[in-house]
Amino acid sequence: MALHHFGILELLPFGGAVWDHFDLGLYGVMLFFLVSGYIIPASLERRGDVRAFWVGRLFRIYPALIAAFAVSLLMLPEGDGSVALFRTGHNLISLAANATMLQDMLNVINGMGVTWTLTYEMVFYFLVTGLFTLGWHRRSGTIAVTFAAIALVFGGSLASSTLAQSVDATRHLVLAAVLIVVMGFLCMLSGNPALARIGALLVAGLALVLLFLNSRAPVFETLLIFATMFAGTVLYRAEHGQIDRAQAWLCCGFVVVSGVAIGWMYNRNGVELNTWNSGWVAWSLSFTGAWATFLAAMLLRKKRFPKPLTWLGSVSFSLYLLHVPLLHTIRPHLANPMPETAGAKTLWTVEYLAISLVAAYLLYRLVELPFQKLGRKALKALERKFPAGPADGPGDGPTDGAARPAAVPAPAEPAGARVPVEAGASTG
C-alpha cells in the first residue's frame, strides 16, 4: 500500500500498462481483508472470551491510531486531504464518528484517508463477535456465500448512503451509532455472559444496518469485501479441520468467481470512478491476484520466513497509518520537482521507504508494544474487579451460545455532508 500511494507506477516506464490491468490498491486491501478474515475469528475463539478479545483489540488499534493522528496533524499543513480530523468544519461529528471507527459508513469523512479500511475491520469484528455469542461462528461458509450472492444479484441496484443524506441526518446517525457502540462495549466488557451477548448483538445489528444501507463505497464492493473476509475464515476452519475441505473450496471458489463476475457486471460504464481503478479487468485481476498471493502464502506457512519479512509484518499497521502523511510531508523537500532520471527515481523511492520504515518502527516500538502490554494488565485488572460469570444460554456447537465458551483448537457522497479525501474505497 505504501508503494501504491507513493505512486510507484508513475515512476515506471510501463506503469500505465500495469494500471490499465492491475490495481495495486485493490490488490493490497483485498489481501489485507483475507488475512484479517483468517486471523481475527481465530483470535476470538482461541481466547474463548469476548472481553479479552475486545480489550486486546482496543489496546492494539487505538493507541497507534491516536498517535498517528497526532503526529500527522503536527506534520501536515491545513488543507492537506490525507488527514481531515478537526479540519472539516464539523469537528465534533467528525471526532465522534472517527472514534467509533465506523465513520466510512456514517457518511463522515475519514479522519485519515487510509482509515476507511478500519471501518470494515470494526464492522467485521462486530459481526464476528455477534456470531460467536450466538454459537453461529462456524457458519462462515454460508455467510461468505450469502454476501457474495447478494452482491451478485443486487450489487448494481442497492443504493449506498441512504441513511444520512444531509448534515442533520448524519449528525443523528452518528449520535445513534455512538450510543449503541458505547452501550455495546459496556456490556461486552462487563464479564457477564448474558450482557456480553446483548452487547455483541447490539453492535452486530448496527453493523448490518450500516453495511447494507449506508456504505460509502458501491454496494457490490462493500458486500464483496465481507464475502472475502468470511472466506478467509473458511480457509482457517478448513485448515484446522472444523469444516470439510470440499465445502471450503466450494465456498471460496464461489466467492472468487463472484468477485470476477461482479467486476465485469458492475465495475464499468463510469462506476469504476467510484472504485478508483481503470475498470473491470483491473478489478478482476487485482482481486484474483490477492487470492493467489494468500493461497501461495498458505502453502508456504510451514516454512520459515526470512526475519525481514516477519519484522515488516510487525510494523505493518504503523506503516499503514503513517505512510501517506509522511509522503505528503517529505515529498516537497525531497522530490520537488519530481525526479526524471532512473537513478533519481530510485533514490527518491529508497529515501521514502527508509523514512517510512523508520517512522513505523518508532511508532511500533514506542506506542504499539507498550500499550499492548498495558492492555494485558488492564484485562487482568478487569478480571479481578469484575470476574466473568458462568456461561449460559442455548446455542449450537461447542460454545453453547455463551459469551465465554470453551476455546476451540487451534482498507457518490451527498453534497455538503462530507469532505472529499484522497483515498477511495479501493485505494487503501
Where are these regions (language model features)?
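Functionally critical transmembrane alpha-helices in membrane proteins and complexes, commonly lining
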Residues: M1-L44, F59-L65, F69, G289-T293, ...
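Aromatic-anchored segments of alpha-helical transmembrane domains
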Residues: A2-H5, F147-T162, V203-S215, G253-R268
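Membrane-interface helix-loop-helix regions
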Residues: G15, I61-F126, R139, A149-L163, ...
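Interfacial loop-to-helix transition and helix-capping segments at the boundaries
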Residues: G16-V29, V108-Y120, A159-I180, S190-L201, ...
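Alpha-helical transmembrane segments of multi-pass integral membrane proteins
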Residues: L26, E221-R237, W249-L369
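Transmembrane alpha-helical segments and their boundary/interface "anchor" motifs
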Residues: L26-M30, S43-S82, G89-A97, F124-Y125, ...
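Membrane-interface junctions at the ends of membrane-embedded or membrane-associated helices
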Residues: S43-A52, L134-T142, G191, Y236-W249, ...
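Membrane-proximal cytoplasmic C-terminal regulatory module of class A 7TM GPCRs
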Residues: P332, P337, L369-P409, E413, ...
